[in-house]
């Protein structure tokens, strides 16, 4: 038992050492941790209520308001922290929904094959045949605008890629000796799926899921920018950007947060995939 733990720790240490050699991945991880930490601690570190009018209209950055105020006098730093919180919440929850649905359907299609594989994959192909942004916009227009609507829409639109990835892995894994041995021993199909096959498919799924999370955060911001997502006075990176379309405001305010939040997972993903 101790030897197994030692081997596990050695493998984890080797993974961490390889990750640390990738400087861009470390930098992206640091940025992501900073943004996530600020978002999670927003109720503690935000100086003002993000929806309260606390100062003059359009005040420049200063000692009292570090990032200034918006057009109606709300503190920009507080709104930025809560907006990042909203984007992270939407991204994580939508990714969990998409991953759970995609993994489940991919396992069923890959392991059982036959009619189940045909039905699931043809439905997957049908969903993927629609232009992604058009499908999201149509769904967002049908349902009432709001954070939960966007989370559910993105969660139920982003699963096909994960399903195809899992199915491909399952098709190769079901021919391996350990799966054949479990089948010969009379193990139930769902035990084999979730105890033998699923753990061996999680590495590529996790890498893919982090990319999906970045895309869902960007999609949430885009829909909020168009007025189909988070509604004012609630703070979102999208509706904050919509209210700051003048070039003067864009050059003075830290809107690069949305770019950092979207791009920081990518170098980390490439490092993990190695």
Indicate where each model-derived feature is located.
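Generic hydrophobic transmembrane alpha-helix motif, especially the helices
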Residues: 66, 70, 76, 97-101, ...
């Amino acid at each position: 038992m101790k030897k197994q733990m030692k081997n596990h720790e050695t493998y984890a240490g080797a993974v961490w050492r390889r990750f640390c050699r990738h400087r861009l991945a470390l930098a992206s991880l640091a940025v992501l941790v900073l943004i996530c930490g600020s978002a999670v601690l927003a109720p503690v570190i935000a100086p003002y209520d993000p929806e309260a009018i606390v100062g003059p209209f359009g005040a420049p950055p200063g000692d009292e308001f570090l990032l200034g105020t918006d057009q109606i006098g709300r503190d920009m730093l507080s709104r930025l922290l809560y907006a990042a919180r909203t984007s992270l919440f939407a991204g994580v929850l939508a990714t969990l929904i998409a991953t759970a649905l995609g993994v489940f359907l991919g396992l069923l299609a890959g392991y059982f094959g036959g009619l189940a594989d045909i039905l699931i994959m043809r439905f997957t192909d049908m969903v993927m045949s629609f232009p992604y942004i058009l499908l999201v916009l149509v769904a967002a227009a049908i349902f009432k605008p709001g954070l939960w609507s966007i989370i559910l829409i993105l969660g139920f639109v982003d699963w096909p890629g994960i399903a195809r990835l899992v199915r491909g892995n399952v098709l190769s894994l079901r021919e391996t000796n350990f799966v054949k041995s479990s089948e010969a021993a009379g193990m139930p199909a769902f035990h084999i799926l979730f105890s033998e096959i699923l753990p061996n498919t999680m590495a590529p799924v996790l890498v893919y899921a982090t990319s999906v999370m970045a895309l869902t955060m960007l999609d949430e911001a885009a829909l909020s920018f168009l007025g189909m997502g988070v509604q004012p006075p609630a703070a979102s990176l999208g509706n904050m950007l919509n209210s700051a379309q003048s070039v003067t405001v864009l050059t003075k305010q830290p809107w690069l947060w949305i770019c950092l939040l979207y791009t920081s997972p990518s170098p980390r993903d490439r490092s993990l995939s190695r």
